[in-house]
Every structure is written in structure tokens, then in C-alpha cells.
Amino acid sequence: MAGNTLGQLFRVTTFGESHGLALGCIIDGVPPGIALSEADLQHDLDRRRPGTSRYTTQRREPDQVKILSGVFEGVTTGTSIGLLIENTDQRSQDYSAIKDVFRPGHADYTYEQKYGLRDYRGGGRSSARETAMRVAAGAIAKKYLAQKFGIVIRACLTQMGDIPLEIKDWAQVEQNPFFSPDVDKLEALDELMRALKKEGDSIGAKVTVVADNVPPGLGEPVFDRLDADIAHALMSINAVKGVEIGEGFGVVALKGSENRDEITKEGFQSNHAGGILGGISSGQQIVANIALKPTSSITVPGRTVNRFGEEVEMITRGRHDPCVGIRAVPIAEAMMAIVLMDHLLRHRAQNADVTTTLPRW
């Protein structure tokens, strides 16, 4: 099974399944001399882990990460960093009734078509549980980018169902269980989640992720454009069905005179491009949005077939998120950080001696 590695110089390889013994990852390309402890990774893992509020899955996983290699006396050595998180709250019996049934909207059917078999326990490798290791790896990238270059990466929920959320106050994002920057909408979000729980249904969401203080020049035309790699990384997150960079699909309704980001002596006058021009960072804030589908793990009955071609009624049991967009916030930050870290190392490897007299804003 290929496709488990992301990045070229900063390379993250993950392994493990939802109901396996553990999840793990190997991270190559981490510069030596970075102060690093398990506590540095745990903060973001705690933001992602299940069972932290009544709005997310009640699977209780502590997600305690262990650093197995690549750190000596509290600093990175420059060698491969190995990380491990044990699974401790699996309930595989919850899935025994569906081992021969293809859950609609899930990867059951496609995994079995591809491999001829599948791990039906919680989706196996296709489960979003795998993203815990991405968050751990992303925490390393976030720390390096912040300490060495002042790059700050943040994400928040900006829509749930038909409830739009304005980015009013980033300080409020970590103060509520929805990662919402709009505290005026918290009551509406709570009411929606209560209604979904009563109905046994789920809802989609939009998450916005931004990166500030990114230097100009990151990105490798033409096939490794920065926006292409960011979109690739974000699209790989479970349940993501769409990615926008900057204005995204909104550019369809704009004229060229409206969409172009004019430049004056004071700098760019707008940021419809989302901080990336020609696949290369401009020095502006990088902005991306992701659309996440409503999970298909719901108790509303639906039709499907089993492995024998028989039509059956499907009701998904187990512990699931009514809105996967909530816990996608730290995952989106991690994927943005991994891509920026990789491109920063690649840029420095080739262009470390490049200097220009162009202004930077």
C-alpha cells in the first residue's frame, strides 16, 4: 500500500489502523538542535483527540504520544523521529454486525474493490483516527516555523451547516468546543448539534486555515506549486470534498479588475490570491478553506448492499462525530505546517544565496 508519505525534504510517513494496537509515524528532515519534548506535541493532540466534548465522538482515547527516536537530551538530533500513540479504547464488537456490509458514503466498498479485503473495524486505515499522527508531526513543524521564522498557523470553524461564522476574534477559538471565532453563534451551533443528535443525523462544515509571516518565494513551479501542495495535503484529510485557496470559487463572479491584487508602495491592496501567486508565496497571509462532508456514520436508516450482492438496510452503530469539521481544525493546521516546512527547507536548499532589492510588506 503506497501513499503513506507526504513531503520531500520534510517527510512524514504514518502507519496504523483505527482498531489496531497503535498508530505511528516516522518524520525525516527535522533539523538538529530543536528543543523538543512530548509535551510540545501533546497540546495539539489534545485539541484533536476524541471524547473532549459532548459534540464529538465519545470514544475515549488519551492519545498520549511517545517519542521513540530522533531526540537526545531534549533536542532533535537530525535523524528520523519516531512517534507512537497506543489505541486503548477500541470497541471492535460495535462493528461485527457490519463486517459483510458496505456502509454507504464510507470507504468500505472501494477498499474491498482495491485490495480484495478490508479491516471493517472502524474503517481500519481509512479512519480519521490516522490523523492523530499528522497532528503530532505538524506540531513539530509548527514549532520550528514559529521559532525560526515567526510563522504562525491558525485554523477555525467558519461554517456548520447553514450557519456561517465570521472570523471576529481568534482569541475565542480556543475558548469554546466548536473552535468558533464567532461567539455570537455558539448558541445556534449548540441547538443544531442537539437537533442532529436527536435525529441521529450529521452535518457538513467549512474550516479556514491561515498562515501569517510566510516569507515570499516558497513554492516549486510547475508541478510542486505551493498552492497545489497545500491543496493536495488538505484534500487528503478524511471527509474533505473541496479546497479553496484565497477567494477560491468566489473568483467565478469577479471581474479581472476586481480580483487582481493591486500593489502600491504600501503593499498589496487586497488578497484574493490567498498569499500565493504563480504557485509561489507572496509574503501575504496564506488563506485556505476546506469543505467537509457530513459523516455517513448515522443512525438514520439507509439502503446498501452486502458482499453477497443483497440489498440491506443500514444503521451505523458505534461512536461517531455528528460534525467532523470540529476536530478537523488542528488537522488542517498540521497539514498546512507540514507543507510549509517542506517547502521552506526546499527553498533554502536551492535558493539560500538569492537576494533581491524588492520591498517586502
Curated annotation (Swiss-Prot):
Native source species: Cronobacter sakazakii (strain ATCC BAA-894)
Cofactors, names only: FMNH2
Known EC number: 4.2.3.5
Catalytic activity: 5-O-(1-carboxyvinyl)-3-phosphoshikimate = chorismate + phosphate
GO cellular component terms listed in the entry, alphabetical order: cytosol
Record: residues binding NADP(+): R48, R54
Keywords on record: Amino-acid biosynthesis, Aromatic amino acid biosynthesis, FAD, Flavoprotein, FMN, Lyase, NADP
Protein name: Chorismate synthase
Subunit structure, as described in the record: Homotetramer.
